[in-house]
A protein has these predicted regions:
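A short loop-to-beta-strand structural motif that recurs across blades of beta-propeller domains
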Residues: 12-17, 60-62, 104-107, 146-148, ...
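Acidic/His-rich segments in extracytoplasmic proteins that coordinate ligands and/or metal ions
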Residues: 41-64, 68, 72
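Beta-propeller domains
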Residues: 1-27
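Flexible, glycine-rich linker and terminal segments associated
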Residues: 223-226, 231-234
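Recurrent small/Gly-Pro-centered beta-turn motifs in extracellular repeat architectures
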Residues: 1-4, 57, 98, 141, ...
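Short loop/turn segments that connect beta-strands within beta-propeller blades
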Residues: 19-24, 65-70, 108-113, 150-155, ...
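A short beta-strand motif characteristic of beta-propeller blades
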Residues: 25-37, 70-76, 113-120, 155-161, ...
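Beta-rich, blade/repeat-based domains predominating
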Residues: 34-52, 78-96, 100-102, 120-136, ...
């Protein structure tokens, strides 16, 4: 996801790049080379589900066809001011964090309706969102080091703590292991199933949202300040 110019200077100029597994650029503007039917301003978190690419764009959820990049739909989320992280449940429900003013998590249903999923006081600059293997919604705080697991009704099931604060991205593996980036400390915390939490990587400038490449068995981490991507073999 590339935001392009600031919205005030050049709205609707964001684009999506396609990368090879080694980090080389396959297509600089896979989405965004043309603007035919495209509206994309400042996209942040993204996720793939059901042959579709989802991204949050300020107060909209944008959905694209994964094979062609064609825009499919844009859903306005009332009350959103800057959505950031995104997770998609097995039934197509989208959960998206709104990091500031307000600090909440939104729920966007498959029919396009939306509502606040949680505004719990434990949310402190909520950022990364993922769905665990039991269908729970896991949210990473950037304002502290909390990693909060909610059930589907919005109740807190448990709170874990990353090794360092400033959480951003989260990946949950099939075996339940979690990886969380710290955008403030440039590190990755590993949450083992035995309760151990440890830093497995450091020195990643502005380690932001991330994804897991299951073919190469690696974490892929945007380094915002470097306009680059980092790769960590697991």
């Amino acid at each position: 996801m590339n935001s392009g110019k600031f919205r005030a200077d050049g709205p609707n100029d964001a684009y999506v790049s396609l990368l090879n597994p080694d980090g080389s650029v396959h297509t600089p503007k896979w989405i965004g080379a043309t603007r035919d039917g495209l509206e994309l301003n400042d996209p942040l978190g993204s996720a793939i589900s059901g042959g579709k690419l989802y991204t949050v764009d300020i107060d909209y959820l944008r959905i694209f066809d994964l094979s062609s990049g064609k825009p499919l739909s844009s859903i306005k989320v009332d009350g959103a001011t800057g959505m950031n992280g995104i997770g998609i449940s097995s039934d197509g429900t989208v959960y998206a964090s709104n990091t500031r003013n307000p600090e909440v998590v939104f729920k966007i249903n498959p029919d396009g309706s939306s509502a606040v999923f949680s505004d719990h006081e434990s949310l402190s600059l909520p950022n990364g969102v993922a769905i665990d293997n039991d269908g729970n919604i896991v949210v990473v705080n950037m304002g502290d080091n909390k990693v909060i697991t909610f059930d589907q009704n919005g109740n807190i099931k448990k709170t874990e703590y990353a090794a360092e604060s400033g959480g951003d991205g989260i990946v949950i593996m099939e075996d339940g292991t979690k990886y969380v980036t710290s955008v403030r400390h440039g590190s990755v915390s590993k949450f083992s199933n035995d309760g151990d939490v440890s830093v497995i990587a450091r020195g990643i400038p502005n380690a932001a949202s991330m994804c897991y490449d299951s073919i190469q068995n690696q974490l892929v981490i945007p380094m915002n300040s470097n306009y680059a991507m980092g790769f960590i073999q697991l």
